[in-house]
Amino acid sequence: GRDGYIAQPENCVYHCFPGSSGCDTLCKEKGATSGHCGFLPGSGVACWCDNLPNKVPIVVGGEKCH
């Protein structure tokens, strides 16, 4: 697995509320060990996942969300 900001189609982040459990739930549903609400410059608050399966897309730096 890998760590990163989990991506929606088109390289968009999943927005979140700092301190909420939403990202942890989302990441675990996708097969990660855990997740939390982080901050991605240029995108704002975004879900970060730890040990996400390689088949699940993560945000690619420099690519704009379409």
From Swiss-Prot:
GO MF: sodium channel inhibitor activity; toxin activity
Which residue intervals define the domain LCN-type CS-alpha/beta in the entry? 2-66
Gene3D superfamilies, per database record: Knottin, scorpion toxin-like
Domain writeup: Has the structural arrangement of an alpha-helix connected to antiparallel beta-sheets by disulfide bonds (CS-alpha/beta).
The record's Gene Ontology cellular component field reads:
extracellular region
- Intracellular or extracellular location(s): Secreted
One of the protein's GO biological processes: defense response
Task: Show the PROSITE patterns listed in the entry.
Answer: LCN_CSAB
Record-stated family = Belongs to the long (4 C-C) scorpion toxin superfamily. Sodium channel inhibitor family. Alpha subfamily.
Q: What does this protein do?
A: Alpha toxins bind voltage-independently at site-3 of sodium channels (Nav) and inhibit the inactivation of the activated channels, thereby blocking neuronal transmission. As it competes neither with the classical alpha-toxin AaH2 nor the beta-toxin Css2, this toxin is an alpha-like toxin.
The superkingdom of the source organism is Eukaryota
Source species of the chain: Buthus occitanus mardochei
Database matches in Pfam families? Toxin_3
**Name this protein carries in UniProt:** Alpha-like toxin Bom3
Q: Which UniProt keywords apply?
A: Disulfide bond, Ion channel impairing toxin, Neurotoxin, Secreted, Toxin, Voltage-gated sodium channel impairing toxin
Main subcellular localisation: secreted
Q: Which cysteines are joined by disulfide bonds?
A: 12-65, 16-37, 23-47, 27-49
Tissue note: Expressed by the venom gland.
* SMART domains attached to this UniProt entry: Knot1
